[in-house]
Amino acid sequence: MSRRNPCKYEIRGHCLNGKKCHFSHNYFEWPPHALLVRQNFMLNKILKSMDRNNDTLSEISGAAELDRTEEYALGVIGVLESYLSSINNITKQSACVAMSKLLAEINNDDIKRLRNKEVPTSPKIRIYNTVISYIDSNKRNTKQTIHLLKRLPADVLKKTIKNTIDIHNEINGNNQGDINVDEQNE
């Protein structure tokens, strides 16, 4: 078997020369250095195509553009409620990204205050602890939290989303109530 040089176009992605190309396209014939260069190039290509700042959706697809996302039209809570009621064709990915953004908005201390008000045997304590753990995970690594949420079964994810929205509304309701009481005292 003759050992031909690896195709430089194949190393940098894909060779379009077809049968006219006289270089080797068989990876088993390539020297280790050429394989490493190809692997590094492909990994860099994947890394560049990922949008790490926004919502882990690809920039190439255009999904990261604000005016094209469901969140821009519906808001974070709207996306989650649409996913719960199965309207507006909200995907699990979009719901998980919106859930991650909602978790970033909620303050741990507010949930701990709500949890401390409950009776020690209350089933709500477990729900509060679950949401607190997701918030902590989200602060450490947003992408990993989104990945964990996506791996949940659909019914468990929906329960988690519903509980988180309820807690968010409860916190906002309490904060609004505190503001109204302060205004009345003045």
Swiss-Prot record:
UniProt remark on domains: Contains a zinc-finger domain on its N-terminus essential for its anti-termination function. Contains an oligomerization domain. The central globular core is responsible for binding to RNA and phosphoprotein.
Zn-finger (C3H1-type) residues: 1-28
Pfam family, one: Pneumovirus_M2
Span list, region Binding to the phosphoprotein: 126-163
UniProt-recorded name of the protein: Protein M2-1
Localization annotation: Virion; Host cytoplasm; Host nucleus
Gene Ontology molecular-function annotations: RNA binding; structural molecule activity; zinc ion binding
Lineage: Viruses, Riboviria, Orthornavirae, Negarnaviricota, Haploviricotina
Posttranslational mods: Phosphorylated by host in infected cells. Only dephosphorylated M2-1 is competent for viral mRNA binding. Cyclic turnover of phosphorylation-dephosphorylation of M2-1 is required for efficient viral transcription.
Modified residues (Phosphoserine): S58, S61
Region feature (Globular core): 76-171
Entry keyword Methyltransferase: no
SMART domains xrefs: ZnF_C3H1 (SM00356)
Its biological purpose: Acts as a tetrameric transcription processivity factor that binds in a competitive manner to RNA and the phosphoprotein (P) to prevent premature termination during transcription. Transcription anti-terminator that enhances readthrough of intergenic junctions during viral transcription. Preferentially binds to poly(A)-rich sequences. Plays a role in the association of the matrix protein with the nucleocapsid, which initiates assembly and budding.
Disulfide cross-links: none
Self-association and partners: Homotetramer. The homotetramer interacts with RNA. Interacts with the phosphoprotein (P); this interaction is required for protein M2-1 function, localization in host inclusion bodies. Formation of a complex host PP1/M2-1/P allows P to target host PP1 phosphatase to the M2-1 substrate. Interacts with the nucleoprotein (N). Interacts with the matrix protein (M); this interaction directs M localization to cytoplasmic inclusions comprising viral proteins L, N, P, and M2-1 and mediates M association with the nucleocapsid. Interacts with host PABPC1 (via C-terminus).
Region named Oligomerization: 32-49
Site label Involved in RNA-binding, positions: K8, F23, K92, R151
Keywords from the named record: Host cytoplasm, Host nucleus, Metal-binding, Phosphoprotein, RNA-binding, Transcription, Transcription antitermination, Transcription regulation, Viral transcription, Virion, Zinc, Zinc-finger
PROSITE patterns, per the entry: ZF_C3H1
Single Gene Ontology BP annotation: viral transcription
